[in-house]
Amino acid sequence: MAAAAEQQQQQQQQGFRPLDEASLVAYIKATPALAARLGGSLDALTIKEVGDGNLNFVYIVLSDAGSVVIKQALPYIRCVGDSWPMTRERAYFEASALQKHRGLCPDHVPEVYHFDRAMSLIGMRYIEPPHIILRKGLIAGVEYPLLAEHMADYMAKTLFFTSLLYNSTTDHKKGVAQYCDNVEMCRLTEQVVFSDPYMLAKYNRCTSPFLDNDAAAVREDAELKLEIAELKSMFIERAQALLHGDLHTGSIMVTPDSTQVIDPEFAFYGPMGYDIGAFLGNLILAYFSQDGHADQANDRKAYKKWILKTIEDSWNLFHKKFVELWNKHKDGNGEAYLPPIYNSSELLCLAQKKYMTSLFHDSLGFGSAKMIRRIVGIAHVEDFESIEDASKRASCERRALNCAKAILKGRRQFESIGQVIVHVQSFDRD
Amino acid sequence: MAAAAEQQQQQQQQGFRPLDEASLVAYIKATPALAARLGGSLDALTIKEVGDGNLNFVYIVLSDAGSVVIKQALPYIRCVGDSWPMTRERAYFEASALQKHRGLCPDHVPEVYHFDRAMSLIGMRYIEPPHIILRKGLIAGVEYPLLAEHMADYMAKTLFFTSLLYNSTTDHKKGVAQYCDNVEMCRLTEQVVFSDPYMLAKYNRCTSPFLDNDAAAVREDAELKLEIAELKSMFIERAQALLHGDLHTGSIMVTPDSTQVIDPEFAFYGPMGYDIGAFLGNLILAYFSQDGHADQANDRKAYKKWILKTIEDSWNLFHKKFVELWNKHKDGNGEAYLPPIYNSSELLCLAQKKYMTSLFHDSLGFGSAKMIRRIVGIAHVEDFESIEDASKRASCERRALNCAKAILKGRRQFESIGQVIVHVQSFDRD
């Protein structure tokens, strides 16, 4: 088996070649599943490379009759100048997760037209303008009235339907085994989310000198380090559902009517709270960045209220939809809560309450960990980075950091998302 | 890959034939790894079948010059008359776990001489007399002065060295993926430990009519059902270490000087507390059964004290050895607690305390679940079954059941094993 896997890997290495525009056209012509999406004539394609070139090539390919996006993984990622070797097999997990999640939630996951494992190449739906990356919309101060509803729908469906609440243990463990191989991506997360921010690490950075002491305080905070250890273990050990694995506001494309979740190359079976927390935590970051984007034309006060409302609605709608799915499928294949045991609506309701409370606290923990790492770790967010005045940026970041630290430490005290909102607002003063 | 696996499975089915004594001799002669253990002449072997014939054939094979045990898995298990189909692949996981655990703890795990996957056949060390099954020794009232020390050693080494405290995430996930395939055995555990005792199930039984109401009370105990759901999820989702998976007192062979752990066919990556709890819980069952074995010659009072002492020592020594291993290997490959983060002995000590407290509570939870299922579930223990007077047996069982229920519900309140011992004693009155 090991030998077979090795051989397969070698073949894949042999079959791999990074595409440029010319070879891309040839590739499309030779691939019916892609050619068909672009219509008959493939001689007048418009091709635009939109990847940042550091992780993947991303080509938008347009013809008179159609469009596709071609995403090809490169065998490394590049951060802060250096490149880290990184398996191209992440494309396989990205394609697998897109296909699985689209099957569960077609409204919010783009279609995969074609996957070529040897080439680490995904051909998928072009998510057309006016879709933009949600993070950019949040920076611009654009309201998305359906965002909470859509993301609640996406999270409830992808998490519920890949958990033991819906699947037999046999099916669940098959999925777990499959995604164990995406371990390189999990290790990257471990390092940048759960380790580096809490130690002196080469690539850590912060808005210096303003936040130097804040970053040092994170590295010296025993209570924080005890909490992060627990979350890190849970992240690796607990195969609760098939996660997106990187569900921040840069992995979501939006218009006022549409929400599309992309880029699940970190997909693995992990704790549900990691996905939920990523989304909520990044909304809280967006909230704290708003003062840095306020100007005379727009003080962003109304927009901040909308963000808070979106955070609150996202959790509450997720909760509602998730429990609805649970009730709807309680007599299905899932073996976690067998009807003959949880045999009254009162008891099932108690079990659900316990489950959801635990999930809520996990989400708050992971969400605050994701916030912290964006302020004192390697990868920062454009929400703050785009605030040019470093002093103002640092002030926004500090409030977010202090808020996150308090949530991480005290997460088990929160009984509702409303209480979290009040907590967030309490940090929103200079 | 799926096709390859299927083909392999078919070949294995083709290669499988249950051995009888005659074909066993031929098999041994044709297998150098076994023949060598028995010395030159293989024509005067003494063969004894000691398996119960329901799960596996177990042959003891003796020659003038040596000995082996041959264990062959059958494609079903038989319980209460009916047979359940059960993959013979459990032999593969048993052999793998024996080999892995023996590498980590050679003093307490027998050597595997030979494994034949197609035949589901393990050739291993014959654990010679005066070794007996620990459970039988406990029923006979025999003290094993080194038992706690040996089992603490076994549990500390097998659990620590297969956890993220010692291994990289990459190695850990490889192991997790491998053992995901032993899912049929996990499902059996799920059913008989975490489900059936809490519902009306065909094979449940209890010492009737004495315990009928007690069994019904378990099925109607909402608090108990909420706790068992949490443990069940943890059992399936949490890949903390490579467990034995069935570490009761029937899986341990002892003399006063030697302790050998056998039969890990339920091995999988699960929560450490499941193994620890199985051992401690079965000792508590043995404790509560003693009054049923008392007679004029031996009131078993001193023996009961020895059992309690063994429970206390087992946990305390396990705790000591486990933390010692952690300290010894804290600068190794394990990535869960990186030295640059947990960078003072005080902080590491706090982290260990938190980890061990959580593990203690898990162990109490799983241990009490294992006790409950042995009283109102399908598979009972000889400790109680061998008490002929049903009324007396029921009285012993009821005290064990009530003790277990209270531990399961209140496990997070216990701060030391000493408190648990006091709690156990408090149920030891008629």
From Swiss-Prot, chains A, B:
Keyword Oxidoreductase carried by entry: no
EC number, as in UniProt: 2.7.1.100
Catalytic activity: 5-(methylsulfanyl)-D-ribose + ATP = 5-(methylsulfanyl)-alpha-D-ribose 1-phosphate + ADP + H(+)
Stated induction or repression of this protein's expression: By sulfur starvation.
Organism: Oryza sativa subsp. japonica
Role played: Catalyzes the phosphorylation of methylthioribose into methylthioribose-1-phosphate.
Subunit-level organization: Homodimer.
Xref: SUPFAM superfamilies: Protein kinase-like (PK-like)
Organism superkingdom: Eukaryota
Lineage: Eukaryota, Viridiplantae, Streptophyta, Embryophyta, Tracheophyta
GO molecular function: ATP binding; S-methyl-5-thioribose kinase activity
Entry-linked Pfam families: APH
UniProt-annotated binding residues for ATP: D52, G53, N54, L55, N56, K71, R125, Y126, I127, D263, P264, E265
Binding site for substrate: N56, D246, R373
Descriptive protein name: Methylthioribose kinase 1
Top EC group: transferase
Keyword Nucleotide-binding recorded: yes
Pathway involvement of the protein, from the record: Amino-acid biosynthesis; L-methionine biosynthesis via salvage pathway; S-methyl-5-thio-alpha-D-ribose 1-phosphate from S-methyl-5'-thioadenosine (hydrolase route): step 2/2
One GO-annotated biological process of the protein: L-methionine salvage from methylthioadenosine
